């Protein structure tokens, strides 16, 4: 399936139906009086978070969504039917932004969330509504109100427990493939990964979701390489696994390059809990491994994990370290939910 993480969409709610001008006509009833019904409301525009989606690709092929108009009122005091609603179905993690791409209108993070974006126009009054003591046979009715319209942006930020960051060719996709059932493209050249990938990790009978994003290079926040737009997909992660290629020229400099991009991006990524790991250690001599480990430790100011996704060495330890941080975050969320839980006085 192709991946698309943002789309511009036009939405319009339905117009209200017009009220009806009608009079009661029956045998032996000379002055039946007005009986025009009201118009129906226009359809609303909803957005709903559904299961089974992880891309916005459907909105590449259809960008215009219009709800149905309300039906007009009819005689015998019959009101028009409400117009059919239109529902935009999106994956969990989708944000709805105004046309300025800054104002957040909705943030859908849980399956089943449903938010009304636009309300349909009200139906017009039929002439029965205008009957008064001084005007027993009004010949006027209201038209329905127009619906609302706007352009919106849908932006997907994948929901994962842990995220993989690093320079291109740091071994992120290999790590994802080794620890999950995901099958990312793996090759020995930069930017093999062109869009984010998700996988479910199982360790010690537990599960968590791991996200792999395309590699960052120096100047990514200014648009270099693939830029930093994909960093939005790890904004919701509790912990980052920063992989540094052990075969690169200088592990410390490689680490600092990515850290600078995280700081430049903002969004609190630089403050996320970070686990640092030196990858591809099976390709290093003992002397070079020691040198790269020391360089990385000085740059990160913490002891890095050592792993090889190919041989599996050090991988279980990295997964358990991620799981420990994720569990801590989940427990904190549960504790916070208990604090705010409503109780009768």
Curated annotation (Swiss-Prot):
Would you name any one GO CC term?
cytoplasm
Q: What Gene Ontology molecular-function terms does this entry list?
A: GTP binding; GTPase activity; magnesium ion binding
Positions annotated to bind Mg(2+): 173, 193
Q: Which InterPro entries does UniProt cross-reference here?
A: G_OBG, GTP-bd, GTP-bd_Obg/CgtA, GTP1-OBG_CS, GTP1_OBG_dom, GTP1_OBG_dom_sf, OBG_GTPase, P-loop_NTPase
- List the cofactors: Mg(2+)
Residue ranges of the OBG-type G domain? 160-327
Root EC class: hydrolase
Q: What is its main location?
A: cytoplasm
> What does the subunit section of this Swiss-Prot or TrEMBL entry state?
Monomer.
Q: Which protein is depicted?
A: GTPase Obg
Species of provenance? Azorhizobium caulinodans (strain ATCC 43989 / DSM 5975 / JCM 20966 / LMG 6465 / NBRC 14845 / NCIMB 13405 / ORS 571)
**What gene, per UniProt, encodes this protein?**
obg
